[in-house]
Regions:
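Sequence/structural signature of beta-propeller domains
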Residues: 1-224
């Protein structure tokens, strides 16, 4: 996730479960360890030094305060469990993104079935909204969801799929563009092997992270 206040990126790692801060070139600035094995899958900046984290196995969202002096991940200020469509412990929440509304937070379920859930988040809490399931931006050919990002500046939702090797860019009103993550497209010399996270900034720079420890940066050209 992109933090526009610090102008740095934040990501999560598993085994050990940690939050990692990176600069725009992918250099690690600090590692913030957690107090156990939490199976972190996604992180989203909410503003005001607040972050939402998703835990795949537990189907849980938690909020944490992280500032420039944080060295160990503090206890969650709030948590929410969405126990929906539990078919596999390894097919849970894979992406988080702030939505169009001031307090909207979108949560992506990886597969079985593919789905976006919409929650309402206040400064101290998360709660499920009345319109729980959002289907508008999930094309039929998508095999999984491995990351999610909403660009509020342009009103675009980015849905990342490592099994389909694409990013689907949607305006939530029906317009859609597909970005291939295979060799020969967008300056890629090799396929992105396992894309797991996506973010962008206010300058139209797009970042994708992939296992094993790969970092990609895409910048807009005059013709794109």
């Amino acid at each position: 996730t992109w933090n526009p206040d610090s102008r740095t990126l934040f990501a999560v790692t598993d085994h050990p479960s940690s939050v990692v801060e990176l600069d725009t070139e992918g250099n690690v600035l600090r590692v913030i360890p957690s107090d156990g094995d939490h199976d972190f899958e996604a992180i989203e900046y909410l503003g005001g030094n607040r972050y939402a984290l998703s835990r795949e196995r537990e189907r849980t969202l938690t909020t944490h305060c992280i500032d420039s002096s944080t060295t160990v991940l503090p206890p969650a200020t709030y948590s929410l469990t969405l126990d929906v469509n539990r078919h596999s412990d390894n097919a849970g929440f894979e992406g988080l993104a702030q939505g169009r509304g001031e307090h909207a937070l979108m949560v992506a379920q990886e597969k079985k079935p593919l789905r976006l859930y919409v929650t309402d988040q206040s400064p101290d809490a998360l709660s499920v909204s009345d319109s729980l399931t959002h289907r508008a931006s999930l094309p039929w050919f998508l095999k999984d969801i491995s990351g999610l990002h909403y660009d509020r500046n342009n009103g675009l939702l980015y849905v990342l799929s490592h099994e389909s090797d694409v990013v689907v860019v949607s305006d939530l009103d029906g317009g859609r563009k597909v970005m291939s993550l295979r060799r020969g497209h967008y300056g890629l010399r090799r396929d992105i092997p396992q894309a797991e996270g996506i973010a962008s900034d206010d300058r139209d720079t797009l970042w994708i992270v992939s296992e094993p420890n790969l970092f990609y940066r895409f910048t807009r050209t005059a013709s794109s």
